[in-house]
Amino acid sequence: MSNITILDEATANKIAAGEVVERPVSVVKELVENSLDAGANRISVELTQGGITGIKVVDNGYGMPAEDVQLCFLRHATSKIKRAEDLNSILTLGFRGEALPSIAAVSKVTLTTRTEDELAGTTMQIEGGYMQNVVPTGCPVGTIIEIKDLFFNTPARRKFLKTANAETSQVSDLITRLAMARPDVRFELRSGNRVLFSSPGTGSLKDTAAVIFGLDNVRSMLEIGYQGKLLSVAGLISKPVLTRASRHYQNFFINGRYIRSGFLSSILQQAYDTLIPAGRFPIAILHIDIDPTQVDVNVHPTKMEIRMAREGEIQEELLAALSDSLNVPTAITGLWEIMPGRTKNTATDQRAENLEVKPDSKEKELQPKESQHPRLVACDLPSGKIMPPRHDQEQLHFSSRRIAPVRGKNSLLPDEGSSINREEIPPVVDVKEQQLKENPNTYQPAETLGFPVLVPAGQVPPTYVLAHGEGGLYIIDQHAAHERVLYEKYLYLLGNYVEAQMLLEPLTLEIPHHEAQLIIKHIVDFNELGFILEHFGGDTFLLRGVPTNAITEPKEVFLDLLARLQENPSQKVEKNLVLDHLAAAMACRDAVKSGQHFSAVETKALLDGLARCQKPYTCPHGRPTLIQISQEELKKRFKR
């Protein structure tokens, strides 16, 4: 007796549906892409319980004739291609004929459609892959498709779905990307009676981007337009001053299709090399048109991944297009933090004065004009703010409010109520504890044992500092070294006392819906970390308070944390990890950048600060801060 069984069609369809239909967002993607292929310029998506119990998509496309209504639910039935050769030049979003039968196999579907040539439309109902009835009906031109009880007949799949809010967030993220792909189409996303997202549909990418990212961010973006031999590029890319902590805000569209591509993301990052710090990523909306014969979209069931021929030439042209847009004066506006003038009446200000960056000239004076040159952030100051706001920003006003101490593995202070033998604690801990009580911003660590005593010897523009010591010659990465110094200072301060600075004028945050749900879920956790938030209705929040040491760019720091939280699969606010990221983000932003020229005083201050770090040999991102060339290696190289 044969052990091989030919599965019936219904069972085969349920299995095949697993490749195409993973969750509600998969259904929405397939249905909306069908609407776009049908020429619709108005598409409405309505969710019930995040799409788990209901999805309704309405479009004003050209609809389907009555004879095609039943055919569209047959597997591999499609109007997009006729033969295999058509795959070489496919421009539609769908083409396999798998989506509708896969959706129908695991849900209850009602399809209503009419073409312009027909007097009456057609309604068809399918349940679990089996047709229930087909009747004529009155309806406008276009298509209405309703999906109910997704995975009702496959409970194993249904139990792995997330909460309604989580599923809604995924759909919201998809719709915003589709709106960027087609700014000429008006998209609307609703959950119950609430409108979550609505794009203008004016055809302007800037208008659409302003709705998604906010008008202020769009003003900090550059338009890109390029026509080459192999491809054309259009879209928006952020100025180097506008970055995020993840690649989530990078959007690539090949021939109108949204894709995920590490290849394209690496090219984008290469274009920003030396313009933004490591670990920071630009925002981008890039529409790339390529000869369809050079692109294979038939790679993955979701069609989110593609293959491209002639990748080397594509990389060369795309990099040229991006570099041309970034090599304009307006592209780097605001890249440097400039010290505004202020009264210098404290020891902190006087010591900061000695660390002012010297311009690249033959002048011996160490006092450049503050309006012309960036200032090196003091790396060993015992107190004071790091990097005040830029001169072109509004001055923020604060009032203090103490937040309960946040303690974790990075805390240098004992837990309250713990039993302590004072004789076992080195004196330096008692000193630090006393300093911290008197002035929470005080931080002056002891020198690290084993770290070489370095004597400054000069600078190798634009990035490196030379020094010599017992071990030979040392080459220091100025940005990485300063980043490590600031990171340990910030981590110390945040790990012991989180003090919130209350803004007299709160900052308004307009957040995409899927991120707004995370804020609502974790708003108490954020408050404990010093980010005092108030839900202002819809997807708008008021940022009323920020951690003391994050006041230079509080909005950017908070959005970075939100991006990291979104990347975390568990989407839990783990305080130690958040504090670590907050310290690293502030250090990366405030550290000196490549190209700053140091005086001898500034170089000595940087090396002294590095010597006091607990882990002076790498920056927070794991890059080395310095390398050593031993005396033996030098003698060998010089044949001695």
From Swiss-Prot:
By what name is this protein known? Answer: DNA mismatch repair protein MutL
Domain of life (superkingdom): Bacteria
Q: Which keywords, in A-to-Z order, does the entry hold?
A: DNA damage, DNA repair
* One biological process term in Gene Ontology: mismatch repair
Q: Which family, according to the similarity comment?
A: Belongs to the DNA mismatch repair MutL/HexB family.
Return the CDD domains for the record: HATPase_MutL-MLH-PMS-like, MutL_Trans
Q: For the region Disordered, what residue ranges are annotated?
A: 343-389
Q: Basic and acidic residues compositional bias: what residue ranges? A: 350-373
Enumerate the Pfam families for this protein.
Answer: DNA_mis_repair, HATPase_c_3, MutL_C
Q: Which GO terms describe its molecular function?
A: ATP binding; ATP hydrolysis activity; ATP-dependent DNA damage sensor activity; mismatched DNA binding
Gene3D superfamilies the UniProt entry points to: 3.30.230.10, Histidine kinase-like ATPase, C-terminal domain, MutL, C-terminal domain, dimerisation subdomain, MutL, C-terminal domain, regulatory subdomain
Q: What biological function has been recorded for the protein in this entry?
A: This protein is involved in the repair of mismatches in DNA. It is required for dam-dependent methyl-directed DNA mismatch repair. May act as a 'molecular matchmaker', a protein that promotes the formation of a stable complex between two or more DNA-binding proteins in an ATP-dependent manner without itself being part of a final effector complex.
Could you state one GO cellular component term attached to this entry?
mismatch repair complex
